[in-house]
Amino acid sequence: MLLEGRFSVVQMNTNRRLKFNQPSRLPNSGKSGIENERVLVLVFESISWDIHTLCTIASLSRRFCAIARRILWRRLCVNRAPGMVAALSGEDPSGRIDGGWHALAKLMFFCGGGESTRYFNLSQPTSGHFACESRFSKTSGRFFLPKNCRRDLLYMSDPCEHQAVGGDEHLGVFRGVFREFMRSKTRECLVRRQAALEEKVRCPYCGGRVWSMTAARLVPKSAARRLGSREGGLEFFVCVNGHLHGTCWLIPLSSEEEDNGEDDDNSDGSVI
């Protein structure tokens, strides 16, 4: 899946799945110039793995798409968030990751926007966009886990603030990712409660089916506190690959609260 951006070749509607061109099998014979994989890696290292350029390159042809899927998305993730990737992938950052490296890259850099769901009403959808900077923290992740699931590892972003269309309220859009979701206590709880997968909502990062944590009654009160939202003013989903996305109504902070707000410790997270 390609990431969205300002380039026309990667534009999409945020409520639709992004689709990569089907990658072709690359022959074993060597390639010269920009199609050489080592050359591509060196080029991206020289530009600090610029996400917009990578999106453009990956959309040029099936060959470039295949190289991006096999090498470039993973190298981008490792380069931009080494600690987070090490925690998510274990001892083998060169191996596979649930949902694929392209989905993790999109989650790192792209705010998916928001739209109305069963438990969260918006007068108009809010478009997704590239996030200039995102901070992911496993400390934040604990606030989104029920008490009996606190051993799970979940990296969460800070909410991305949007002005709600047609109103004065501020919309918060947030995202996160679990480590080894298939083995997690959170998934075990969902299965034990026989929570149904949503019919109309899909993961904006991998396109997988999702559970509503609100419908499953697995949203702890601490999640609203962490987001700066009122209780009941949020909804979030977790997909079968462990990607989390959600929306909330943000409570405006007074100037005194902003000045005295506690800064989170970044030692357990990654600024991307």
UniProtKB/Swiss-Prot annotation:
Coiled-coil annotated spans: none
GO CC entries: nucleus
InterPro entries: EID1-like
F-box domain: residues covered: 29-81
Gene Ontology biological process terms from the UniProt entry: abscisic acid-activated signaling pathway; regulation of seed germination; response to abscisic acid; response to osmotic stress; response to salt stress; response to water deprivation; vegetative to reproductive phase transition of meristem
Name of the protein: EID1-like F-box protein 3
Lineage: Eukaryota, Viridiplantae, Streptophyta, Embryophyta, Tracheophyta
